[in-house]
Amino acid sequence: MRYETLDEAAAAGAAPWSDEATEHSDYHVAVFRDAYPVALGHLLFVPRWNKNVIIEEALKYAFRFGHQKVVTGEWEAYNVGINCGEAAGQTVMYPHVHLIPRRVGDCADPVGGVRGVIFGQANYKKTGYQKPA
């Protein structure tokens, strides 16, 4: 089912983000801590409306936020990604952008970036998944 707004998706139980996990919220985008982070600081940038122009705004917000974290030295690098569709691993069927902080040594071989995700952290539904400390 397609939801037109974040509020509509939340009311239907299709948007699992909670007020307690909110990092930022404005007219266009809400930012939440990921419930199943692949790295400490993993955030979701969620457009308030399911419209391409607003989804693009969420993507811009994520890039700007990640860039600022690198400039201030809080992060060394970052990945930005969107899972579009079930075959791509999307489990929450409302658009959202992942911003994943990266640090030297967080995986054995970072070559390829998002092509390899982060070993052992991709499938948070498997037995034994542990959130990064």
Model features per residue range: what roles?
Residues 1-133:
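HIT superfamily nucleotide-processing domains
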